[in-house]
């Protein structure tokens, strides 16, 4: 098992990267205070991994119950959190108990928010089963739900006690889900590490063939890059905003399309959008934009959305959490592996780019 530590002083925690769940019980025992745990998962993941995880935990002497959510972003609501609260009370969870989030980013966000707010915070563990969650959402302590049509507008920063990644869980994902996860993977290379981009591009076939060595390297590298950023800026005051690369446009598309597209697909289109903004600002060349588009296409990701409602997406962008005084702040590329933050005052430029993405 590979271990990587996120160093946040008293909130530091390990990321454990394995090829099965055998060490999960040992990982939980390393910090547990009480004997009760609640495993939160969704209907899809429940069919594959819940029984195995619960058995490992029970053998370790942990009294574990289960709560199953409906899958998908459309169910990432306060109502889902209320359901978890009811189960927590029913199971008599207290401040020494543990919440385990077994699933993708939606499960992690909901379960983490419930853990952050129940009894003013109880321990929780992320057990991400999708490539997207393993690469991004399980690390860093962001939790929350959507509200009134706005993505992640209700939430909290709340760090897990541990992240346990079994890289082989992605074998049960549809190819489309794997590609969506690769949007967050390639994002890390685009913002900080050109060599990592080259590695992903070169090993794309091995990723889709579930090469364990490649998958473990991806998990370790993703956690290393994201972990470094989170360690420098836990609450997204400055540097951490670079992790939102492609997300300003991506989140707006995701919301306007009513979550018809996967998160990673929207991020991919958003990445092309920020490269186009940088191109029009003469920061980089059209050739580089096309190079990035070729990589995304190789990973099975969209680079445009024909028929995109430009006006609605443009208006939705202003709900982004980086907006200050009604001014749009973007994370833009300078080259592959380097980005910078920039306030865009030319709203027509944004509309021009959105129009490009709609063709």
Swiss-Prot record:
<dbReference type="GO" id="GO:0009073">
    <property type="term" value="P:aromatic amino acid family biosynthetic process"/>
</dbReference>
<keyword id="KW-0520">NAD</keyword>
<feature type="binding site">
    <location>
        <position position="247"/>
    </location>
    <ligand>
        <name>Zn(2+)</name>
    </ligand>
</feature>
<keyword id="KW-0057">Aromatic amino acid biosynthesis</keyword>
<comment type="pathway">
    <text>Metabolic intermediate biosynthesis; chorismate biosynthesis; chorismate from D-erythrose 4-phosphate and phosphoenolpyruvate: step 2/7.</text>
</comment>
<comment type="similarity">
    <text>Belongs to the sugar phosphate cyclases superfamily. Dehydroquinate synthase family.</text>
</comment>
<dbReference type="Pfam" id="PF24621">
    <property type="entry name" value="DHQS_C"/>
</dbReference>
<dbReference type="GO" id="GO:0046872">
    <property type="term" value="F:metal ion binding"/>
</dbReference>
<dbReference type="InterPro" id="IPR030963">
    <property type="entry name" value="DHQ_synth_fam"/>
</dbReference>
<keyword id="KW-0456">Lyase</keyword>
<feature type="binding site">
    <location>
        <position position="142"/>
    </location>
    <ligand>
        <name>NAD(+)</name>
    </ligand>
</feature>
<protein>
    <recommendedName>
        <fullName>3-dehydroquinate synthase</fullName>
        <ecNumber>4.2.3.4</ecNumber>
    </recommendedName>
</protein>
<comment type="function">
    <text>Catalyzes the conversion of 3-deoxy-D-arabino-heptulosonate 7-phosphate (DAHP) to dehydroquinate (DHQ).</text>
</comment>
<feature type="binding site">
    <location>
        <position position="184"/>
    </location>
    <ligand>
        <name>Zn(2+)</name>
    </ligand>
</feature>
<keyword id="KW-0862">Zinc</keyword>
<dbReference type="GO" id="GO:0005737">
    <property type="term" value="C:cytoplasm"/>
</dbReference>
<dbReference type="GO" id="GO:0003856">
    <property type="term" value="F:3-dehydroquinate synthase activity"/>
</dbReference>
<dbReference type="Pfam" id="PF01761">
    <property type="entry name" value="DHQ_synthase"/>
</dbReference>
<feature type="binding site">
    <location>
        <position position="151"/>
    </location>
    <ligand>
        <name>NAD(+)</name>
    </ligand>
</feature>
<dbReference type="GO" id="GO:0009423">
    <property type="term" value="P:chorismate biosynthetic process"/>
</dbReference>
<keyword id="KW-0479">Metal-binding</keyword>
<dbReference type="InterPro" id="IPR030960">
    <property type="entry name" value="DHQS/DOIS_N"/>
</dbReference>
<dbReference type="GO" id="GO:0000166">
    <property type="term" value="F:nucleotide binding"/>
</dbReference>
<keyword id="KW-0028">Amino-acid biosynthesis</keyword>
<feature type="binding site">
    <location>
        <begin position="169"/>
        <end position="172"/>
    </location>
    <ligand>
        <name>NAD(+)</name>
    </ligand>
</feature>
<keyword id="KW-0170">Cobalt</keyword>
<keyword id="KW-0963">Cytoplasm</keyword>
<keyword id="KW-0547">Nucleotide-binding</keyword>
<dbReference type="InterPro" id="IPR056179">
    <property type="entry name" value="DHQS_C"/>
</dbReference>
<dbReference type="GO" id="GO:0008652">
    <property type="term" value="P:amino acid biosynthetic process"/>
</dbReference>
<dbReference type="InterPro" id="IPR050071">
    <property type="entry name" value="Dehydroquinate_synthase"/>
</dbReference>
<dbReference type="InterPro" id="IPR016037">
    <property type="entry name" value="DHQ_synth_AroB"/>
</dbReference>
<feature type="binding site">
    <location>
        <position position="263"/>
    </location>
    <ligand>
        <name>Zn(2+)</name>
    </ligand>
</feature>
<feature type="binding site">
    <location>
        <begin position="129"/>
        <end position="130"/>
    </location>
    <ligand>
        <name>NAD(+)</name>
    </ligand>
</feature>
<feature type="binding site">
    <location>
        <begin position="105"/>
        <end position="109"/>
    </location>
    <ligand>
        <name>NAD(+)</name>
    </ligand>
</feature>
């Amino acid at each position: 098992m590979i271990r990587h530590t996120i160093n946040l002083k008293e909130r530091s925690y390990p990321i454990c990267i394995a090829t099965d769940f055998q060490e999960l019980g040992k990982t939980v025992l390393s910090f547990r205070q009480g004997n009760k745990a609640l495993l939160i998962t969704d209907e899809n993941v429940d069919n594959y991994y819940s029984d195995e995880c619960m058995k490992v935990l029970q053998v370790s002497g942990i009294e574990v119950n289960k709560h199953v959510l409906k899958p998908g972003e459309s169910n990432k609501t306060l109502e889902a959190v209320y359901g978890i609260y009811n189960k927590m009370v029913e199971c008599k969870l207290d401040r020494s108990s543990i919440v385990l989030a077994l699933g993708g980013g939606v499960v992690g966000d909901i379960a983490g928010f419930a853990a952050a707010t129940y009894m003013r915070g109880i321990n929780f563990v992320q057990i991400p089963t999708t490539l997207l969650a393993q690469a991004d959402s399980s690390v860093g302590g962001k939790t929350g739900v959507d509200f009134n049509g706005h993505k992640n507008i209700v939430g909290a920063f709340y760090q897990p006690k541990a992240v346990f990644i079994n890289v082989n869980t992605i074998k049960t994902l549809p190819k489309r889900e794997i590609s969506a996860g690769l949007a967050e993977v390639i994002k890390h290379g685009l913002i900080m590490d050109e060599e990592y981009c080259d590695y992903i591009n070169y090993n794309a076939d091995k990723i889709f063939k579930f090469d364990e060595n490649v998958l473990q390297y991806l998990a370790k590298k993703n956690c290393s890059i994201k972990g470094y950023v989170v360690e420098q800026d836990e609450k997204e005051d400055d540097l951490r905003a670079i992790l939102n690369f492609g997300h300003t446009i991506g989140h707006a598309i995701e919301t306007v399309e009513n979550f018809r597209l996967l998160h990673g697909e929207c991020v991919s289109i958003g990445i092309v959008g920020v490269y186009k903004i940088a191109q029009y600002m003469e920061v980089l060349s059209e050739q580089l934009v096309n190079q990035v588009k070729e990589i995304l296409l190789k990973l099975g990701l969209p680079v445009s959305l024909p028929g995109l409602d430009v006006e609605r997406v443009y208006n939705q962008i202003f709900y982004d959490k980086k907006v200050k005084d009604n001014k749009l702040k973007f994370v833009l590329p300078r080259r592959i592996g380097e980005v910078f933050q920039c306030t865009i005052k030319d709203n027509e430029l944004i509309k021009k780019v959105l129009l490009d993405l709609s063709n």
